[in-house]
Structures are given as structure tokens and as C-alpha cells.
């Protein structure tokens, strides 16, 4: 599944394999507070795919709103980074880069930790 629009990138991650998705977004600090359940699920699925992780990488099982996992704070910082990159796209990249390519996957490429470039 490819995400075409991540409303404000990166907080928690995807559906639990064992049992569904939180009904409502709680403790949303970076994503829009009025995000729909469907858009939140789509966004979380996108994060999971782009980083190759499951929900529990950032979330406490069945308590998505908790901030007990360090990766959740990291995720919020990374969402802000992507938001900034999108806001300053022309400054960073010029007209040749479309906003749609500025995602978590741009650097992570399916891995929780981006691999450094080695020439």
C-alpha cells in the first residue's frame, strides 16, 4: 500500500495484527486533531510500511494514546521534520521534486533505522 498524502506525518504505527485499531485518535500532538479514523488508519499503515515496523514499535498495546515508548517521541520529531521539508520544498529541492515523494520512506526505505550512505 502506498500513501499518497500523509496529513502531517509520523506518530504511531498501523493496525495490531492481533486485534484491530483504536477507535479514535487520542493524544494527537502532531497529526491533525480532526483527522478521521480512516485517514488515521491509512497514515499509520503508511508509517508501518515505510519503516517496516508494527504498531508496538511506537505504541503500548491497546493503549495507543500512552507516551511510554521512546520511539513515539522520535516519531513526532520525524513527522515535524517531514512537515518542514514539505513546507520548504522549493527551498530544499527546487521545482524538480514533487511533494508526494517527501515521506518517511524517502530515507527509511522500509527499515526502522535509515542506513547511512556509503559511497
Would you name each region that the model predicts?
Residues 1-6:
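Positively charged n-region of N-terminal signal peptides that target proteins for export
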Residues 8-18:
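Bacterial N-terminal signal peptides
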Amino acid at each position: 500500500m502506498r500513501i499518497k498524502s500523509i496529513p502531517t506525518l509520523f506518530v504511531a504505527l498501523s493496525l495490531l495484527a492481533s486485534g484491530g485499531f483504536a477507535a479514535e485518535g487520542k493524544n494527537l500532538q502532531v497529526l491533525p486533531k480532526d483527522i478521521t479514523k480512516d485517514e488515521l488508519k491509512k497514515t499509520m499503515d503508511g508509517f508501518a510500511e515505510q519503516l517496516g515496523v508494527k504498531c508496538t514499535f511506537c505504541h503500548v498495546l491497546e493503549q495507543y494514546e500512552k507516551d511510554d515508548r521512546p520511539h513515539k517521541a522520535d516519531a513526532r520529531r520525524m513527522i515535524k521534520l517531514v512537515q518542514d521539508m514539505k513546507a520548504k520544498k522549493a527551498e530544499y529541492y527546487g521545482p524538480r521534486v514533487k511533494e508526494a515523494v517527501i515521506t518517511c520512506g524517502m530515507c527509511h526505505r522500509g527499515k526502522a533505522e535509515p542506513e547511512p550512505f556509503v559511497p
